[in-house]
From Swiss-Prot:
This is Pheromone-regulated membrane protein 10. Pfam families: ThrE, ThrE_2. The keyword Transmembrane helix applies. InterPro entries: ThrE-like_N (IPR010619), ThrE/Ser_Exporter (IPR051361), ThrE_2 (IPR024528). One of its GO terms (molecular function) is transmembrane transporter activity. The lineage of its organism: Eukaryota, Fungi, Dikarya, Ascomycota, Saccharomycotina. Keywords: Membrane, Transmembrane, Transmembrane helix. Coiled coil: none annotated. Belongs to the ThrE exporter (TC 2.A.79) family. Residues 29-42 have a biased composition (Low complexity).
Length: 786
């Protein structure tokens, strides 16, 4: 009988173990499948709960396709002129762009406030942890206050092998010789990357499941031992059981009769109703042969489990209570190490998730800042890859004009989280210099990701150095300075150009900020007004006012030189999508300007029959005075693009050197715009790279004003901006209809073709200069160069 009972108990224990194992496997499989299937959506929801989200501009859902959205995005960027940083980057209607300023690139209402990601990560874990608040408080009382210091986020359990896409930029090809400025900019791919949030949560579930299995097996073994001991005591026929061996649960006492359960305790302790012919009627009594009824009035003491002589005194009861409470305390103390271990594991995962969110946030914020402040677009992806390598983040990046698609991978779960960083691209030389400083400190491990986030947010919140009304007058000043050296204007033309340039600046910085509808037609209206007024001033008799000089000088700062330069650099860097879209938009932009000039000149010619037709100036200024206007224009264009006064000396020196090369090479190579621009940009690139290597400056900010000096000079050498004047004269002529048909169609495209020639020459010269400074610079990659 006893042997059969033991077999039954062992079978039940094995059944309990098997059921626990099956439940464990099913719960783990269900949790893994549910998390892997909804990883991207859950990650985005977690990101929203942690305020890890990034402002985007209004989606162009009404546009028909991706290509049209790219064109419209470029149109709204306003980065086509020589002052792309303030074209329309500070528009008040674009409130979703990290900008909330008085025409300043600063942080905005949707900006992400700095928060303690440790608490946010703890909130994530609390939604998935199975610890009760009482257990957490008990563990905190046992000395878990040092969790933050003992938990290490560098545990290898949180690292995963790096996947293959990190090697995309290490192939043996032409990019190996693409050496650049910074001697420490290159970062080797990490051997291990940090796991994602989803992988950390799944690891938390695995720890909890293991703890559940261990606890269940421990409880099953203890219950098996207790039940066996009780049954053996019954078989031995003991009449009295000490208080410490009494069953704890009086409502679940098994009685065996022929190996089967014969009775169940239903009432208070001390009374048992049993059935059976040979039931052991007295478990704690004196009668050993009680037949049938436990309560038998005819036999003394047969109905009482505890007789009078076995009754416990009050002292015995108090002693028994103390023993029970002590036993419970020992049991809780035995569980403490396991719970403490689980809490430490959760603390490590919390710290890991917090640091992971901080690093991902830094990558996205730095990407936003680089796009806002004019980092070289053809190397944006490389900046982000180098940063993610240093931070041990598994990231992939795809750049489109005005948009960066970021994918954070989790190698442990084979899932990824996609973020879209979209903003208006501009140019801010001083803030770009500051962002570059933060970037250098982070990749050289001189600054953590959390400190980098604070610095980036501070830079985004800062106002521009110069307000819009100052930029309006600087616009007129730059227009006046560019007229003599680039377009051959006389002294009297400076005042007219200053007035007209200020009008263009007011249209750009004031009117475009007030109306979104007007900002879409700013270029056309500005060219119409400038052409109309320029021909009107040039038609004044004996005034020596040159129509061509004042018109081209007033429009010099909205020429699409910068955007064509970025497009040509992207195409040369094999960024086909971004380069093609940007180049095509620049051609259309040039046609807009040409159409506006033609229309404005035709309108005035229709109103006044004696309108001037002169394109070139008959009284040019002395060539030696031109060298005085180049540094003045450089200072003006640098201040418009928010350069600090400490950056001006290097900018002026490089710009003047480049113009000297342009001037003297133009004397020897007639009608060769692209070759002249290539020589000048080659010298500019060498000086900028040397400045960055020797004085540890930022090459791109030092070279951009010098590049802006080259664009008007190249345009003026062909007079292509006024190619529409012939069409305007023929439109208002008597035989206008027939004359227009004989006009060569190449005249309308000559301005765009000239711009492309100049930009191609500049891009070739810049790439050649980097090869000259860093002939073997694969692992000395300075990224912030043109």
């Amino acid at each position: 009988m006893a042997d059969s009972g033991d077999k039954d108990v062992s079978k039940s224990v094995r059944f309990d173990k098997e059921s626990i194992e099956s439940k464990k496997r099913s719960s783990v499989d269900d949790s893994a499948s549910s998390y892997s299937s909804s990883s991207s959506g859950q990650d985005r929801s977690e990101g929203k709960r942690n305020n890890v989200k990034f402002s985007t501009e209004d989606s162009d859902d009404e546009d028909g396709n991706l290509f049209s959205r790219m064109i419209k995005n470029l149109k709204s960027n306003g980065g086509a002129g020589l002052a792309p940083g303030l074209s329309k980057a500070n528009s008040n209607q674009e409130k979703t762009d990290l900008e909330d300023n008085d025409n300043v690139v600063t942080g905005h209402s949707d900006d992400i406030p700095m928060e303690d990601f440790t608490s946010e990560a703890q909130n994530i874990l609390q939604g998935h942890s199975n610890l009760t608040p009482a257990q957490i408080e008990a563990l905190n009382g046992q000395g878990l206050s040092d969790i933050e210091t003992t938990a290490s986020s560098t545990d290898l359990n949180f690292l995963a092998p790096a996947i293959d896409h990190f090697d995309d930029f290490d192939g043996d090809g032409e990019e190996e010789n693409d050496g650049f400025v910074d001697t420490h900019g290159y970062v080797a791919p990490p051997t291990q990357v940090r796991g994602g949030v989803l992988g950390s949560l799944l690891k938390l579930y695995q720890e909890q499941d293991n703890a559940t299995i261990e606890t269940s097996s421990m409880y099953s073994q203890s219950s098996y031992g207790e039940s066996t001991a009780n049954l053996m005591s019954i078989d031995s026929g003991e009449t009295e059981v000490p208080s410490e061996h009494k069953p704890k649960d009086h409502k679940n006492v098994f009685m065996r009769s022929g190996g089967k359960v014969a009775g169940l305790a239903m009432n208070a302790p001390g009374q048992i109703y049993g059935h059976g012919s040979k039931a052991a009627g007295h478990i704690y009594g004196h009668g050993r042969k009680g037949a049938g009824h436990i309560y038998n009035q005819g036999k003394k003491g047969a109905g009482h489990i505890y007789s009078q002589k076995n009754k416990l005194s009050s002292a015995d009861l108090s002693t028994e209570g103390l023993k029970k409470s002590g036993h419970k305390a020992k049991k809780v103390a035995g569980k403490m190490p396991k719970l403490r271990k689980r809490m430490l594991a959760e603390a490590k995962i919390t710290v890991h998730i917090a640091e992971l969110l901080q690093r991902q946030r830094f990558i996205l914020r730095m990407c936003k800042a680089l796009m806002l402040y004019g980092a070289p677009t053809h190397r944006l992806e490389e900046y982000m890859i180098m940063t993610s390598r240093v931070l041990e983040i598994d990231g992939q990046y795809l750049y489109l004009p005005g948009c960066m698609i970021v994918s954070f991978g989790d190698a442990t779960t084979r899932t990824s989280e996609v973020q879209l960083v979209r903003c208006t691209q501009g140019l801010n030389l001083w803030k770009l210099h500051q962002v570059h400083g933060v970037y250098k400190k982070v990749i050289h491990d001189q600054m953590g990701a959390d400190e980098g986030n604070i610095e980036i947010d501070r830079i985004l919140r800062e106002k521009n150095l110069y307000p819009p009304w100052v930029c309006v007058f600087l616009y007129g000043f730059c227009s006046a300075m560019v007229t003599p050296y680039a377009f051959g204007g006389h002294w009297i033309n400076l005042a007219i150009t200053f007035f007209m340039g200020s009008c263009v600046g007011m249209m750009q910085f004031i009117l475009s900020e007030k109306s979104l509808m007007y900002s879409n037609v700013f270029e056309i209206t500005a060219s119409i007004v400038v052409s109309f007024c320029g021909r009107a001033f040039g038609s004044i008799p004996n005034s020596n006012i040159c129509f061509g000089a004042i018109t081209q000088g007033s429009l010099a700062l909205i020429l699409p030189g910068y955007i064509i330069l970025c497009g040509s650099l992207e195409l040369q860097s094999r960024s086909l999508v971004a380069g093609s879209v940007r180049m095509f938009y620049a051609i259309i932009y040039s046609l807009f300007l040409g159409f506006g000039i033609t229309l404005g000149a035709a309108l005035f010619g229709w109103m006044y029959k004696g309108a001037t037709n002169e394109i070139s100036c008959g009284y040019p200024i002395s060539p030696w005075f031109r060298f005085l206007f180049v540094p003045a224009f450089t200072i003006g264009i640098s201040l418009i693009n928010q350069a600090n006064w400490t950056q001006l000396p290097a900018m002026v020196f490089i710009s003047c050197t480049g113009y000297v090369v342009t001037y003297w090479s133009g004397k020897h190579f007639q009608n060769s715009t692209e070759f002249t621009a290539a020589l000048a940009s080659f010298v500019i690139g060498i000086l900028g790279n040397l400045y960055s290597r020797i004085w540890q400056g930022l090459a791109v900010s030092a070279m951009l004003p010098a590049i802006f000096v080259q664009v008007p000079s190249g345009i003026a050498s062909q007079n292509s901006l006024l190619s529409g004047l012939q069409s305007a004269n023929q439109i208002v002529g008597r035989n206008g209809t027939n004359a227009v048909q004989t006009v060569d169609l190449s005249n309308s495209m000559s301005f765009g073709i000239t711009m492309i020639e100049v930009s191609i020459g500049i891009s070739v010269g810049l790439f050649a200069s980097t090869l000259c400074v860093y002939p073997f610079g694969k692992k000395k990659t300075g990224l912030f160069s043109l």
